[in-house]
Swiss-Prot record:
Pfam families: DUF179. Gene3D superfamilies: VC0467-like. This is UPF0301 protein BAV3012. HAMAP family: UPF0301. GO terms for cellular component: cytosol. Belongs to the UPF0301 (AlgH) family. InterPro entries: AlgH-like. Disulfide bonds: none annotated.
Length: 197
């Protein structure tokens, strides 16, 4: 997998890269699909951004996903792990965030993690040979050129450096408050709308 978006140019000097960050939706977000979410930003360039929603499990398990795509399952405890709603874009396509990166045919490295969209990583997981840590989604959250920056300037999101522990080890329902705590914020103390004096 090559980079989703192309390299930045000299004209993009003021660009702020949110790659490898968590975005937490602020209370009051009007986009119902992303309200209350924490998103890991996999890639962000001046051309756009791609992220995965971390706290919206589906009813689908890895075992049932593998059955649907005709993979023979020989795996153990990961069979019951949930597949997540990664976002509203390409919801029929799988995205696997994993560590270690490994050598799969369609991957991009994201620091110590990798994002893979090819079937070979799922085949390796089904055979019990896959990455030690994985997070599987259907779909992704995407932003066009300047869209994420605009939403950030409107205070739709808070951002903080991503922590893989939250992605792989924290239960889905606790990921949003855990990401907020990285900023020292208690999500219960956030109001839905800013007040005016």
């Amino acid at each position: 997998m090559t980079a989703i978006f192309r390299s930045a140019s000299a004209d993009d000097a003021r660009f702020t890269d949110f790659s490898n960050q968590f975005l937490m939706a602020m209370p009051g977000m009007v986009n119902d699909e992303l309200a209350g979410t924490v998103i890991y930003i996999c890639e962000h360039t001046p051309r756009g951004a791609l992220g995965l929603v971390l706290n919206r499990p589906t009813d689908l398990t890895l075992a049932s996903l593998f059955e649907r795509i005709d993979l023979t399952v020989a795996m153990g405890p990961t069979a019951d792990e949930k597949v997540f709603f990664g976002g509203p874009v390409q919801t029929d396509r799988g995205f696997v965030l994993h560590a270690p990166a490994g050598d799969y045919s369609s991957s991009i490295r994201l620091g110590d993690l990798a994002l893979t969209t090819s079937r070979d990583v799922l085949q390796a997981v089904a055979e019990g040979q896959g990455p030690a840590r994985l997070f599987v989604t259907l779909g992704y959250a995407g932003w066009g050129a300047g869209q994420l920056e605009s939403e950030m300037s409107q205070n739709a999101w808070l951002s903080v450096a991503a922590d893989p522990v939250i992605i792989f080890d924290v239960p889905a329902e606790e990921r949003y408050p855990a990401a907020m705590r990285l900023l020292g914020i208690d999500p219960l103390m956030l109001a839905g709308e800013a007040g005016h004096a």
